[in-house]
């Protein structure tokens, strides 16, 4: 499958201006560069950002798996037992479809190249048949691409169902092509950029834009300075060219003078050459005598070398015997170490089994503890509800008692007022009767009063009963 690789052009670097001294006035403004802004947060907090990052991570994981399918097809014999028959079958079908697509594309390229070469035969029937066959082949490409998409989804579905196979496939990362690896690196770089973008708050984004604007202004000022420096450099270059022309003129004059000097010095050169030849002959005779002496020294050194070799051979034999003895001791120590390590391995396995059993018991105890905690929370909630109900009942009882006392007080006041009114009425009636009957009926009046008192007592008893 073809991968589109996006290349990023390198940043522009301005001309390097060296060896130029500037004399500028010091300004009162601070020239400290603004500090680069970094996000204050290090983790994603919202669900949407986490979902975005999880989707991008899953996409990168799927791309890593898809770019290794061609390597799996080429090494199918070594991976067939590890990945499973279903996955290998799906991979073979996917590779066959990709190969078919590549064959169609190559065929179309060849036919189009043939059409370009034979543009002068457009009116011929065979040319039209060729164009029709090319269009027919192009119409077959979209269904084939759709089949490749479906097969890719099927292979990814099988690999995601089997995490062990996916991890085993990711180990084969050396089989990935350079284009695919660069594409994955671009996706990882995009993930880092998106992660930093999601961590940046609106306030930080505003600060970042302000930071970029400051950098832009500084860059503009620096560009103006660079332009002025380039103008100064051009002026300096012109001055230097003028000086170079002057120096070239001086050099030419010196060359002419030197040529004249060489003509005059040829005779002196011949004389010095003859003297040098004489000196060379004398040195040659002296060197021959020196060579003979050196050869005698070489013979002496060779005899000494032979004697040293014999001595070193005897020492080498003794060292070899010592080495053999040390090697046997090392082998014995290695065997002893292997026995001790096997015993410790058995002991470690037993302790591992005991650790696993205790871990299972700990899990059971944790489950029981969680159940007891839930029951305790339920009981605590029920107690709180009952306490609230009891408090409400007590408050209701207090309200009822207060209402009863108030009703009793009102009823007592009503009875007292009614008794007082009845007494006043009876007294008024007695006075009227005394005036009519006269003084002779005082005894009857006394009896009437006694009867009135008896009635009042009866009413008092009835009032008490009502209370």
Curated annotation (Swiss-Prot):
Recorded protein name is: Dynein regulatory complex protein 10
Coiled-coil residue windows: 334-382
- Partners and quaternary state? Component of the nexin-dynein regulatory complex (N-DRC). Interacts with CFAP52.
Residue span(s) of domain IQ = 400-429
Q: Which organism is it from?
A: Sus scrofa (Pig)
Where is the sequence biased in composition, kind Basic residues?
A: 458-467
Q: What does this protein do?
A: Component of the nexin-dynein regulatory complex (N-DRC), a key regulator of ciliary/flagellar motility which maintains the alignment and integrity of the distal axoneme and regulates microtubule sliding in motile axonemes.
**Cytoplasm listed as a keyword:** yes
Return the similarity comment.
Belongs to the DRC10 family.
The protein's superkingdom reads Eukaryota
Q: Where is the composition biased (Basic and acidic residues)?
A: 431-457
A GO cellular component annotation here is:
ciliary basal body
Subcellular localization, as worded in the UniProt entry = Cytoplasm, Cytoskeleton, Flagellum axoneme
Q: Pfam families, per this entry? A: IQ (PF00612)
Looking up SMART domains in the UniProt record yields:
IQ
Instruction: List the Gene3D superfamilies.
Output: 1.20.5.190
Identify the keywords attached in UniProt to this record, alphabetized.
Answer: Cell projection, Cilium, Coiled coil, Cytoplasm, Cytoskeleton, Flagellum
Annotated spans, Disordered: 422-467
